[in-house]
Amino acid sequence: MGKRVLLIEDEPNIIEAIRFILSRDGWTVETHSDGATAVAAVAAKRPDIVILDVMLPNKSGFDILRDLRGMAEHSELSILMLTARGQKKDRDMAEAAGVSHFMTKPFSNSEMLEAVRRLAGLDRAQANDG
């Protein structure tokens, strides 16, 4: 596995935090901030994992998630969804749309890294050998 993440997020502080956390573990992190073109970015970049914010400019993360799950080539893609709200209805909507993992901001470095490793199917030994 190439260990590529596409981070679809519009908050610079969150982008830098996730890039820092994952790059130290050998992940290549590319970013995209516009909801309207996010599905095209996933198709173009072909990541192993997508980290998707709920609140984005021009299109919600829920709509992007539904669009991706509706496409055969992305139906099995690992998608981690982030939200600052953390309400049960958000988690329920994400699960109904086919999210792989749901995480609330703020998150710890270890929470993010463990979630991404789990979605990638990496155990601790493989991740540390990276």
Give names to the regions the model predicted:
Residues 9:
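Conserved acidic carboxylate
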Residues 15, 57, 87, 106:
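The feature encodes the CheY-like receiver
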Residues 16-24:
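Charged docking surfaces used in two-component/phosphorelay signaling
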Residues 26-33, 41:
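Short hydrophobic/Thr-rich beta-strand motif most characteristic of the beta2 strand and flanking loop
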Residues 45-51, 56:
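Active-site beta3 strand of CheY-like receiver
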Residues 107-117:
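C-terminal output helix
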